[in-house]
A protein has these predicted regions:
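Short, solvent-exposed recognition patches
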Residues: 39-126
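N-terminal secretory signal peptides that target proteins for export/translocation
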Residues: 1-4
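Bacterial N-terminal signal peptides
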Residues: 6-17
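Intrinsically disordered and other compositionally biased segments
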Residues: 15, 20-21, 53
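A short, solvent-exposed beta-edge/loop patch
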Residues: 22-24, 29-30, 34, 38, ...
């Protein structure tokens, strides 16, 4: 009986630790530091002002990097949904149906899509926005100022994979 209770306690503890590890808050500015943003954008960037906050909707981490030589930019956002808040998959679907034309991106997270700088998407030229859902998290990566859309998407996917590895 005593051994059974100890075993049950151990299992509950391990499950709790696993659950907490899976829901740990992340800092996107630590995952993609300034030096890496400079490599992604191909030029020096200004010092960012990251923000990491808990709110009634969950945990939110954001960081923007802006190039010093051109209009290039890298925008990073992660929302880890809290209990009772909008589910990330629902939020993704709302974004996808917001009037633009979202391109489905395979092989990243549970679900991913991208808006480009096409007029129907309401974005300026040479801008992509990649949205990735993984579990209770919605990742948003914006890259601006890179004319080659395929290159910008590849860079955004690499950033997404780095963030996904920390969730």
């Amino acid at each position: 009986m005593r051994a059974g209770l100890c075993l049950a306690g151990l299992i509950v503890s391990l499950l709790t630790i696993s659950l907490l590890a899976a829901e740990k808050s992340i800092d996107v500015s630590a995952i993609v530091p300034k030096t890496e943003a400079e490599k992604i954008l191909g030029e020096p960037v200004r010092n960012p002002t990251p923000l990491n906050v808990n709110s009634k909707d969950g945990y939110y981490s954001k960081c923007n990097y802006y190039g010093t030589k051109s209009g290039r930019s890298l925008l990073l956002r992660v929302r880890q949904a809290g209990e009772g808040s909008v589910d990330p998959l629902t939020e993704f679907d709302q974004i996808a149906s917001s009037g633009g034309k979202m391109k489905v991106i395979e092989g990243v997270g549970d679900k991913a899509g991208m808006f480009t700088g096409a007029p129907e998407n309401g974005l300026p030229p040479n801008v992509i926005m990649l949205y990735v859902v993984k579990g209770r998290s919605l990742i948003t990566i914006g890259i601006g100022g890179i004319a080659d859309e395929a290159s910008a998407l590849e860079k955004a996917k690499q950033v997404a994979e780095k963030i996904l590895a920390q969730l």
